[in-house]
Amino acid sequence: MSDTIFAPATAPGRAAVAVVRVSGPRTQTAVRTLAGDLPEPRRASVRRLFDADGGEIDQALVLWFPGPGSYTGEDAAEFHVHGGTAVTGALVEALAGLGLRLAEPGEFTRRAFENGKLDLAQAEGVADLIDSETEGQRRQALEQLGGRLSQVQARWREALTEALALFEAAVDFPDEEVPADVAARARPVLETLAAEIEAAAADAARGERVREGFRIALVGAPNAGKSTLLNALAGREAAIVTATPGTTRDVIEVPMVLAGYKVLMADTAGLRDTADEIEAEGVRRARAWAEGADLRLWLVDGSSEETPDLPAEIGEGDLCLITKRDLPVGNAGAWAAEVARRIGIPAAEVTARGPGDMAWLKETLSERVVESLGGGEPPAATRLRHRELLAEASERLRHAIGHDEHVELAAEDVRLAARALDRITGRIDPEAVLGRIFATFCIGK
């Protein structure tokens, strides 16, 4: 790469320290020009920085990383200056005056990828680590950055290479001493690989949920207490609460953390038949969000004296809560028994005003989240991109297994399966895909 890039690696604004990174062939010249000399590699050295006109910029810590032993694999440096915006601005202006270019988002990590310092799956781990908000996200991102998916992919790729060698030998050298039972010898290997890849693809949904959030829907009739419960769980007034049925017209998503995992809790419009066009759209959205949720909490108004109308959508994995048990009217206990009898799942009586009830509910929800996201080993695949490529690879392997009598077709299917796996780590990938992935990074990374 012929040009040299720079960018602030810390967030803009007033702070104790700001870091500006530089990478590329002219890094050494830039450091000498601003700092007066080249510090000892990989040691923080105090230097006074001056621009090209001799004006002092700041007293800074300067770190020099000669390539290829740097993050990007090329000559790189960091300037740690005082965090005032004027100081950072003066340093950025000085670097631009030396002919260096402001980096695009993710360009430092892209250079690391293109110089073989990490593969594409590991680069995605860097992005996930920067974006992590919970312990679950942080741990998963570290696994990705550490090469968990890359190592699994490499093992699969090696096995495919051996199988492909058998098929290609049978095709290219039909008259030589090549085993006649090539397909029979390759079948167990391909079946094992297909099963492992399919399992990883299925488990990728768990990794996606860790990244994006476990989705919990609060569902029920109007005035069942959904908004009140959401506010109690969130610890703030996230939704409007009134005595008027149908107040909630749209899905209100509130992020929170349970057991170290990100959770998206959604208050939804009350489910009922209505002639109101706006409310009807809210009901449609409520049903759609609930259908895609990982867990549904069905709320039944315990203060009502009428037998609850239980929706047919209530399923075995759902939870049912009989709300407003603190009110003197109603039949909360009777409705709990009725729910258990009619739909076969236990129903708990709760009140959003009871600290003990809310503590119990949070603990119960945390257990469900951990059961869904935290069981066993962490998922190798964590993104939709991974899942789609794994599905493509397994499909090709299943085709290859079915081509017992057509070695040429089997070889091509194995080759395409290997190609799909290679795209996970970026060994081959269209430029547009790489650009889209690295564009999600922050500037300076």
Swiss-Prot record:
Matching InterPro entries: G_TrmE, GTP-bd, GTP-bd_TrmE_N, GTPase_MnmE, MnmE_dom2, MnmE_helical, P-loop_NTPase, Small_GTP-bd
Entry's EC annotation: 3.6.-.-
UniProt keyword Methyltransferase, yes or no: no
Binding site for GTP: 223-228, 242-248, 267-270
Annotated residues for binding of (6S)-5-formyl-5,6,7,8-tetrahydrofolate: 21, 78, 117, 445
Domain of life according to the entry: Bacteria
Enzyme kind, highest EC tier: hydrolase
Statement: the UniProt record of this protein carries the keyword GTP-binding: yes
UniProt entry keywords in alphabetical sequence: Cytoplasm, GTP-binding, Hydrolase, Magnesium, Metal-binding, Nucleotide-binding, Potassium, tRNA processing
GO biological process assignments: tRNA methylation; tRNA wobble uridine modification
Predominant cellular place of this UniProt entry's protein: cytoplasm
Protein purpose: Exhibits a very high intrinsic GTPase hydrolysis rate. Involved in the addition of a carboxymethylaminomethyl (cmnm) group at the wobble position (U34) of certain tRNAs, forming tRNA-cmnm(5)s(2)U34.
Protein name: tRNA modification GTPase MnmE
Native species: Phenylobacterium zucineum (strain HLK1)
Gene that specifies this protein: mnmE
